[in-house]
Amino acid sequence: MKALQASTSYSFFSKSSSATLQRRTHRPQCVILSKVEPSDKSVEIMRKFSEQYARKSGTYFCVDKGVTSVVIKGLAEHKDSLGAPLCPCRYYDDKAAEATQGFWNCPCVPMRERKECHCMLFLTPENDFAGKDQTIGLDEIREVTANM
């Protein structure tokens, strides 16, 4: 007689003197990503934070406000989804772990230590792409990022 191979495995565990049958199926792990707009509150929080940090650090927003808008919106998305303003301009194998660690949370360690912002959100005055502004309006962010 031939043995049949099951596609589903079963494990038995003993719980308080009774046997429990637990069914385990082997499914590939996958991640489903969905595009969720950040809340207006988070965008406003990140906008105000960015303005305040630019003033405090003596840095300026990019001459192309589209760059500034996209980065602020990305920070707001991460604030909503991860609970922290993780740098939106980097690739992460595990965003949640990176957000917990804090190294790449805005302002990131390279920005705090050396005034090096990979996102071009905070630029030193001598940077060729630095504008003259340390402010940006919420309406400007909405307008630039409306179709993204």
UniProtKB/Swiss-Prot annotation:
SUPFAM superfamilies: Ferredoxin thioredoxin reductase (FTR), catalytic beta chain (SSF57662). Binds 1 [4Fe-4S] cluster. The active site is at 89 (nucleophile). It is found in: Plastid, Chloroplast. It comes from the Eukaryota. InterPro entries: FTR_bsu, FTR_bsu_sf. Keywords: 4Fe-4S, Chloroplast, Disulfide bond, Iron, Iron-sulfur, Metal-binding, Oxidoreductase, Plastid, Redox-active center, Transit peptide. [4Fe-4S] cluster binds at residues 87, 106, 108, 117. Its EC number is 1.8.7.2. The keyword Iron applies. Catalytic subunit of the ferredoxin-thioredoxin reductase (FTR), which catalyzes the two-electron reduction of thioredoxins by the electrons provided by reduced ferredoxin. This is Ferredoxin-thioredoxin reductase catalytic chain, chloroplastic. It comes from Spinacia oleracea (Spinach).
